[in-house]
Each structure stands twice: as structure tokens, then as C-alpha cells.
Amino acid sequence: MAQTSKYKRVVLKLSGEALAGDKGFGINPIIIKSVAQQVAEVAKMDCEIAVIVGGGNIWRGKTGSDLGMDRGTADYMGMLATVMNALALQDSLEQLECDTRVLTSIEMKQVAEPYIRRRAIRHLEKKRVVIFAAGIGNPYFSTDTTAALRAAEVEADVILMGKNNVDGVYSADPKVDKNAVKYEHLTHIQMLQEGLQVMDSTASSFCMDNNIPLNVFSIMEEGNIKRAVMGEKIGTLITK
């Protein structure tokens, strides 16, 4: 019998760095296997799950732009990096016999399906894990914004933000400020007004306008994805 989850449908946002582990670059096989096991465990519950991965472990568009590259070109390279991460995660999930589909905003039919909203929803209804890659297909938009947009499009109940270096939202960087306070609950407007670096302001505003809650937690602790889906109080919950 499937375990009961708090949410019917969730979007899990993973930074590229979360897949790199301590090295901060590339794909750590141990980390991606752990993430895949956690996602597969959720997929067996009565919860539909879509995943969005960043590409910062391979390439950051902003870094390229800062070094003098054309911003559009640099961002498209970042989108391709997310596809590499998505395929790696898909492979790990399928090794666990978890039915998975990668949908990309930039068509590359030899390796993934093109993103079509109704197709994505149908895959979720069939209890397949859906991995969204290549951002929204346009430069200047982050994968945080992708997570917000896709969550709205597939009518997800919540965005789960798995972080690799922090276990929630703090008033300041806990690595720098020993007096930093961890929030258990925030509103979207608080997050924007206080300049808390949970996600970029475009994504934050979109979540606020569309009443999409966020749960920010550490991805590095085994079982946290399931705990979040079950409704356990972990990390920081951000609501309207």
C-alpha cells in the first residue's frame, strides 16, 4: 500500500551544485544515485513528482557573461548543461526501474521529448517521473524561474527546493554570521523585502503572484525529499 503524502503533485528543484557534491564541479555518481533513490521512493507513493535541475555544476551563463561572452550564448550553454544533468538523473532513475521522461524546452528529439504542457501532465498522471531541462528555452531566465513557471503550468501543490549547502532559509549567511537565525516560516513578500537569497526576484515574484508555496531544505540528508512530501516540518516553508 502506497504511503500517504501531503501533496498530490510536487516540483523538486535541484541546483546543479547539489549533483556535484563537495567538489563543486561535474556530476558526483554517489550524490546523483542518492538523489535518484530518494526521488524513486517518492514516485512509489501517492504523489506525482517532476524535477528541475540547474546546470551550475557544469556551466553558469552569468559567469560566461561576466567574462565577456554574449549573454544569450552563455545562457544557452547553461541550458545545455541542465540537459546533461537531466540525462544523468534519468539514467540513475531508470537503473532503479523508475519510469522517467526528460522534457526539454529546446528541441533535441534524439535525446529527449520536447516540452509540451499537456504531455508533461499526462506523464505525471501515469506516475512517471518528469524531468524538465533546458530552462524555459530563453536566455536571461534562471532555472528557479523555470521551476516556478513549470509548477504553475502543471498545477503542482508546492516547489521543494533541495539545497546542498544549507538546511533552510536564514536571516544571514550562517557560515559567515554566527548570529544568523533560521526561519521556520516566511511569506513571499518577506523574502523579497528582506532580500533573502532563496531564489531570484523574478521567480520569487512569480511564486507570490501565483500562490505557489516553497519548502527549502537540505538535499544532502538522506530521506529529506520524502519527509518534505509527507508534510514533515523540515527546512523553511514559504507561503503567500
Curated annotation (Swiss-Prot):
EC number: 2.7.4.22
CDD domains recorded: AAK_UMPK-PyrH-Ec
Reaction equations catalysed: UMP + ATP = UDP + ADP
Residues given in the record as ATP binding sites: K13, L14, S15, G16, G56, R60, N164, Y170, D173
Gene Ontology MF, one: ATP binding
Entries under InterPro entries matching the protein: AceGlu_kinase-like_sf (IPR036393), Asp/Glu/Uridylate_kinase (IPR001048), Uridylate_kinase (IPR011817), Uridylate_kinase_bac (IPR015963)
Pathway in which the depicted protein is active: Pyrimidine metabolism; CTP biosynthesis via de novo pathway; UDP from UMP (UMPK route): step 1/1
Pfam families, A to Z: AA_kinase
Class in the EC hierarchy, top level: transferase
Domain of life, source organism: Bacteria
Subcellular location: Cytoplasm
Keyword annotations of the record: Allosteric enzyme, ATP-binding, Cytoplasm, Kinase, Nucleotide-binding, Pyrimidine biosynthesis, Transferase
Chain sites annotated for binding UMP: G55, D75, I136, G137, N138, P139, Y140, F141, S142, T143
GO BP, one annotated term: 'de novo' CTP biosynthetic process
Gene Ontology cellular component terms for the protein in this record: cytoplasm
Control of this protein's activity: Allosterically activated by GTP. Inhibited by UTP.
Region: Involved in allosteric activation by GTP, residue numbers: 21-26
PANTHER family referenced in this protein's UniProt entry, alphabetically: URIDYLATE KINASE, URIDYLATE KINASE PUMPKIN, CHLOROPLASTIC
Functional summary from the UniProt entry: Catalyzes the reversible phosphorylation of UMP to UDP.
Family classification: Belongs to the UMP kinase family.
The protein's assembly and partners: Homohexamer.
Name by which UniProt lists this protein: Uridylate kinase
Species this protein is from: Staphylococcus haemolyticus (strain JCSC1435)
Taxonomic path: Bacteria, Bacillati, Bacillota, Bacilli, Bacillales
